Amino acid sequence: MTNEEPVPSTSSVLSAAEKNVKIETPSRKRKGLDIDALWRKKFKDVENQKSPEKSEKSEKTIKEEPLETHPSGERKLRSASKDSKSLSKETHNTISTRSSSSGTPRKKMEPEDVKPNIKMLKKSLPVSFQCSNLNDGTVGDASVMLDPTKISLHSSSVAYGEESQDEMEVIQHSTDDPNGTREEFDYNQIEYGNAVTPNGTYTLYAPDSNYAPYYQYSNNMQSSPQDNAPYLVPAPQSPVSIDDADSINLPNNQRASPATVNWLFENYEIGEGSLPRCELYDHYKKHCAEHRMDPVNAASFGKLIRSVFHNLKTRRLGTRGNSKYHYYGIRLKDSSTLHSMQHPQPQIIQNTYTPPMQLPQRDAYADTVNQVAAIKYMDVEIPDKRARKDNSSSSSSCRDSVSPCMDLPAQQTIQHTPVHSVIPSTQQPAPLHNNNVVSYVVTESDKAAMGKIDLPIVPFPDKDALMATIGFRKLGVGEEELNSLIDIYEILCREILALIKNIDFASVEDTWSKFWSGNFGVDRDHISALCTLDQVQDYIIEVDLALYQTIVDTLIPNVLLSELSTGMTQTCRTFAKNIDVYLRKSLMLANLGEFFVKKKIQAIKYLQQGLKRYTSLNHLAHASRGVLMKPEQVQQMYQDYIRVDINTVHQQAGWICGCDSVMVHHVNNAFKHNLQRMSAMEVWAEWLESIVDQVLAKYHDKPANVIANVGKQFLLNWSFYTSMIIRDLTLRSAMSFGSFTLIRLLADDYMYYLIESKIAKAGKQQLITVIRADKDWPLTTNPQEYIVVANDNDEDLDLEKAGLL
């Protein structure tokens, strides 16, 4: 039993045996309302009205004795009625501190007025619940029929007047034993009675021991961002971003692309002067639009600026009512192309400083306010407000988005690689014109991830069969020009592949432009004439698809096991976004037909799609590898997974999918076995491949369309089963839920990739061409299964909008 201070009339159950009952009622507190204090004040006022000289003794008695033992004689039960309900609101206003006034006479009250209606409670008491017997101090079992007269209620809540009970704060019950230790009890509560009295509504609760706790309590309150030590707090460890011990303190730079940082260095420099923040952000948004990047918000861009150019200060400059925030200490470079976008600004005064009050007119002040502020603060060291808030967090926008603060890893520097280091001196391309594209310095880890050191060989179709089907009478060209075109186009593909191997993406556009403008060994008129032939168009498209597949295989030789760095992944994705723009600009230099241009643009979309999907899959594999390398996380995953009722999952999912129960249990046991053994990523990859091989084993000699249909159905079944397992883990509040979600995403995407590989092998086609199969508009004269059509409604293929026609 606890020795807590009892609160009068918060709970009582039976009048016949009140002396055997003690009600344990922890305080119910909410903002601006102390229930215990209200009860003590109420009784003190009652005793003062009876006997003012005994008020002190009465107060002491209330503090030391519960309601049931208060020497007030025999208690009388009050029945709930409409009259009592109407009186409740009136007496509530009497005890409320908010509604009390000196002008209203206080109503004389008796101690009985504060008692709950126990008759209503008695009628609705449960026949069995956990409680303590005051006679012997024991706690009764939930299955034993107990006398309701000998119970100890664990908690209660009180609602005054018209206030909702949902607004009352529920406080966890706790007791202190004589040894000084504090014991807290977690239990589920059931509401079993309401008692309406003239002074309020009381809701009594008791623990329900028949229902085992399903959800674990977790504190949802977070500490204030102002209490964190660093200004930019790294994201906490999660299954998606597994940080090693050495990288915990690194800022998050996922949103700061190397192209943006390079653009800042090319156009801005630290120096005297100031730039309006809004204009600088407008420049940034235009840069993102030109490079097909998603711009961050203004607050995140401000953090990026401060991470690139340190010690920047912020000043609010301009006339009253028309002032703007400026970055002080940064200026545009003289060589920047942004000067054409810059608003005209008067030059900075270098020699004299004229106070604003001595200026003859307001316009002069408006014209020179920026220069005055710049000179005034030029040589004065003013403490920066941000320096005093190093330990504080930024605004809510910093928490809502990923911080773009740049701190590039070692050896991942940004610079332009000379073109002559990649292309042989005999065939140098034109000088580099696209300065906005960032070249990436290849590290040793990137070279190891590429796999092959030598240049991969691009397969070509049979040239003799092509030449045998072509008539040259009306073209004005002969067999020599055709052979020259085929040979030069092969050299072009090899040089493009060499640039890709050296991560010199900026030179790809120049190499294409040189070929289609007729400066690569073949006259432009000959190229235009030969490209009117369907056979030549089909040959070029086939070579392009083979080249694009080889580019993907070169950059990502193994989508699951290749360890691409963050800079390499971002560079590949940026290149995939912009490569169709490079091709459009190059094709404008040749006099090509509209149909052939559309097929070229559609073909390069395969490369874009493949690079984006496979870099995403590789990123998932990298994050999952971090989870699988930590034994404590894998052990927790195993403990959570063995609690999943796989029979129930199969019963629900099998009714829809109709899968073999033997195979389902085999996959389930293999998954648990891999978790228990803490298998490496290579083992998991082999296991997933074995599942696909087992599913498609009896279809190995079937056409590609049959394998595609079987593979699609398998992917649907796999996705449904995994979603049911994730649902079960969610309901159980599994601690490793995030890790399971990450592994599930990886498994789904890799299964998708494996099915694609099987279809491509059966159809003898390039892997990147499996998706978006449509036969309405083939890319070749003799359509194959995998050739994807160009959509007439696709704005990306609108040649007039693209400026090609």
From Swiss-Prot:
It comes from the Eukaryota. Residues 19-92 have a biased composition (Basic and acidic residues). Ciliated sensory neurons. Residues 260-334 bind DNA. Residues 1-113 are annotated as: Disordered. Probable transcription factor. May regulate some genes of ciliated sensory neurons. May activate the expression of the shared components of sensory cilia, but not the cell-type-specific expression. Together with transcription factor atf-7, involved in regulation of the serotonergic response of ADF neurons to pathogenic food. This is RFX-like transcription factor daf-19.
